[in-house]
């Protein structure tokens, strides 16, 4: 994790980048053999050739399918290029997900130049899903998407997510189950991040956002909505109407700061009462 774009895997000074960024942040003890395998894989990735010898393509495509769907730009696809674990096994790279508390388009609300338009965010293009960075600066996604077979597989995973989970009604069933499961705990939680009423409103809004996002992605796959930012900027008439969506209901940076302070106070009160 870093507030700077340190983990984008795109660097001109490759050797220094490997030593100072990758290995210094390793979560496990590494051997020289481990280092050589990782370096070889990153070098192959940088060439854009023979990607299957360096990347676990199927796993990484699945990772990006979810990242793109949930509109998580506090991640590799955002301007910071962070919040993931780079995992290497047998010379193949994978990306492990981490830190989703600003997913569902809430991260852009807190940027220095906030992006708050729900129509833009929910229709965000699946083929150029990066925010305030370039495709070239995110080589894992870029190099895979340049391969026709990988792009096709990525689209198929997005379609599978839409058909198997959203258009089938499974998502709404699961959403109600999860909401009911935590409802009483949220209502009674003395350290809650928000009021119970705010929680209920956010649950309803999250369901609406996910259903609209799924519909937009399906229309992009069918070419009814443009799937790149350049095309969308040229023709916004095709975008899904999101005028009844308020993403800020889900919370943003300021809400987290205020809620964190409230939570600390409530937690201290609970601890004192238990003495």
Predicted regions located by residue number:
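Long, His/Glu/Asp-enriched segments that create or flank divalent metal/ion-associated functional microenvironments
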Residues: 140-141, 211-274
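Surface-exposed charge patches in extracellular/virion surface proteins
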Residues: 4, 11, 160, 194, ...
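C-terminal catalytic region of ATP-dependent kinase domains
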Residues: 26-29, 87-232
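Active-site acidic catalytic loop and adjacent metal/ATP-binding pocket
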Residues: 52-106, 210
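Intrinsic disorder/low-complexity detector
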Residues: 3, 10, 17, 21, ...
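Short, hydrophobic/aromatic alpha-helical segments in well-folded domains
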Residues: 41, 47, 65, 82, ...
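Short, solvent-exposed loop/turn segments at the edges of secondary structure
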Residues: 5, 79-81, 136
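Internal "kinase-insert"/substrate-recognition segments embedded within catalytic cores
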Residues: 1-70
């Amino acid at each position: 994790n870093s507030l700077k774009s340190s983990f984008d895997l795109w660097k001109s000074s490759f050797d220094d980048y490997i030593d100072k960024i990758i290995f210094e942040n390793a979560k496990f003890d590494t051997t020289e053999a481990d280092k050589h395998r990782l370096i070889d894989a990153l070098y192959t990735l940088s060439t854009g050739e023979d990607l299957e010898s360096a990347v676990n393509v199927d796993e990484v495509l699945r990772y990006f399918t979810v990242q793109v769907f949930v509109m998580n730009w506090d991640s590799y696809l955002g301007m910071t290029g962070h919040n993931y674990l780079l995992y290497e096994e047998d010379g193949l790279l994978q990306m492990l997900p981490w830190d989703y508390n600003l997913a569902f388009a809430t991260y852009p609300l807190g940027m220095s130049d906030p992006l708050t338009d729900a129509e833009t965010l929910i229709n965000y293009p699946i083929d150029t899903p990066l925010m305030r960075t370039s495709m070239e600066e995110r080589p894992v996604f870029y190099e895979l998407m340049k391969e026709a077979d990988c792009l096709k597989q990525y689209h198929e995973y997005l379609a599978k997510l839409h058909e198997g989970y959203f258009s089938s009604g499974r998502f709404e069933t699961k959403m109600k189950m999860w909401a009911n499961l935590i409802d009483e705990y949220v209502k009674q939680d003395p350290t809650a991040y928000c009021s119970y009423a705010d929680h209920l409103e956010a649950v309803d809004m999250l369901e609406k956002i996910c259903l609209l996002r799924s519909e937009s992605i399906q229309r992009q796959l069918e070419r009814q909505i443009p799937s790149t930012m350049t095309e969308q900027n040229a023709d916004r008439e095709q975008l899904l109407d999101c005028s009844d969506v308020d993403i800020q209901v889900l919370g943003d940076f300021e809400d987290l700061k205020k809620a964190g302070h409230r939570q600390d106070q409530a937690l201290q009160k609970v601890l004192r009462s238990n003495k």
